[in-house]
Curated annotation (Swiss-Prot):
EC number: 2.8.1.13
Predominant cellular place of this UniProt entry's protein: cytoplasm
Name of protein: tRNA-specific 2-thiouridylase MnmA
Phylogenetic lineage: Bacteria, Pseudomonadati, Pseudomonadota, Alphaproteobacteria, Magnetococcales
Positions with a binding annotation for ATP: A10, M11, S12, G13, G14, V15, D16, S17, M36, G129
Keywords tagged on the record: ATP-binding, Cytoplasm, Disulfide bond, Nucleotide-binding, RNA-binding, Transferase, tRNA processing, tRNA-binding
């Protein structure tokens, strides 16, 4: 009789990762539950928030592990999270860009540190509750594909996962939709089958960026000038941390035509605004591109690209650059291309690679 494979499940206390653990137990795997403790849970706002690392979530994950009868461990990565995600979040805003902390967390914490912990515990692979699909080509090379439910596909958030990491990662929910996941959790008698999804950046409870910056980075709330494209002052902003490209609300400017944030000028502490048509651009530059190809491409190729999670993929030409970046040329101009965010490109439903918008 062969020994069942050991699998570690990244358990966040949500329905997706809990259903993942239950499904793998049912399939006969030897399952270990792992939860990352990432942020100080002492704040009452964090404890009751809809973030992904609230105190209630640790309790829920532990209770699910007890229900399933699996070993369960909490791994403290608070210092790593602070440096790699929170400090980067602050520094990115200070540079006049808009960060994507969930991608950074996946890159540095979940699929690096936690994966190494899982393997050290003797697991054959790490499973997560992401809605994405891992496949292998004819040569056994791992590939990352979009989840089968377009409304829940999370492959965009996983583009930094390396091929070496993909060899030891699984996404059991990739072929399912959210309703099926909830039904699965209900079938296993998990108490959180109807639990709400996390919505907020986990260290910014209730999405109150001003309160977060006031405590963690007050320099990002330094007022400065709101200027038009010609440099004329139109008013005063509340600090660069309160704005992002494409934003209209909260500018507090009386103007005959609607104005939108076009760029954040960090050296001069200015918010540059303009009309809606000025938001459209037909190209962008990426740095730190991660290729999910056995041999990274060197020649331009046609692709479908996403400039943000909620955006549909659009036709584009990807031109790899010798410095490890890429130039992306869109067939049609795209609205509010935002420095600091990610652009991910696909061959059909397969992730080819992605990088960070300059």
């Amino acid at each position: 009789m062969t020994q069942p494979q050991r699998v570690a499940v990244a358990m966040s206390g949500g329905v997706d990762s809990s259903a993942t653990a239950a499904l793998l137990v049912e399939q006969g795997y030897e399952v270990i539950g792992l939860t990352m403790q990432l942020w100080d849970h002492s704040s009452p706002k964090v404890a009751g928030s809809r973030s992904c690392c609230a105190l209630d979530d640790l309790y829920d994950a532990r209770q699910v592990a007890q229900t399933l009868g699996i070993p369960y461990y909490v791994v403290n990565y608070e210092a790593d999270f602070r440096q790699a995600v929170v400090d980067d979040f602050i520094q990115t805003y200070a540079a006049g860009q808009t960060p994507n902390p969930c991608v950074r967390c996946n890159q540095i914490l979940k699929f690096d540190l936690l994966l190494k912990k899982a393997l050290a515990l003797g697991a054959d692979f790490l499973a997560t509750g992401h809605y994405a699909i891992r496949r292998e080509d004819a040569q056994g090379v791992p590939q990352l594909w979009q989840g089968s439910d377009p409304a829940k596909d999370q492959s965009y958030f996983l583009f930094t996962t390396t091929m070496a990491q993909l060899a030891h990662v699984r996404f059991p929910l990739g072929e399912m939709d959210k309703q099926q996941t909830r039904q699965l959790a209900q079938r296993f008698g998990l108490h959180l089958s109807t639990k709400q999804e996390s919505q907020d950046v986990c260290f910014v409870p209730d999405g109150d960026y001003s309160a977060f910056f006031a405590k963690q980075a007050p320099h990002l709330l330094t007022p400065g000038a709101i200027v038009d494209q010609q440099g004329h002052s139109l008013g005063q902003h509340k600090g660069l941390g309160c704005y992002t490209v494409g934003q209209r609300k909260g500018l507090g400017i009386a103007h005959p035509t609607p104005l939108y944030v076009l760029a954040l000028d960090a050296p001069h502490n200015q918010v540059i605004v303009g009309p809606a048509e000025a938001l459209y651009q037909q190209q962008l530059t990426l740095h730190h591109v991660n290729w999910l190809e056995p041999t990274p491409p060197t020649e331009p190729f046609a692709s479908m690209a996403k400039i943000r999670y909620a955006a549909p993929p659009v036709e584009a030409r990807v031109e790899p650059l010798p410095d490890g970046g890429a130039q992306i040329y869109f067939n049609q101009p795209q609205r509010a291309i935002t420095p600091g965010q990610a652009c991910v490109f696909y061959d059909g439903a397969r992730v080819v690679g992605g990088g960070w918008i300059v």
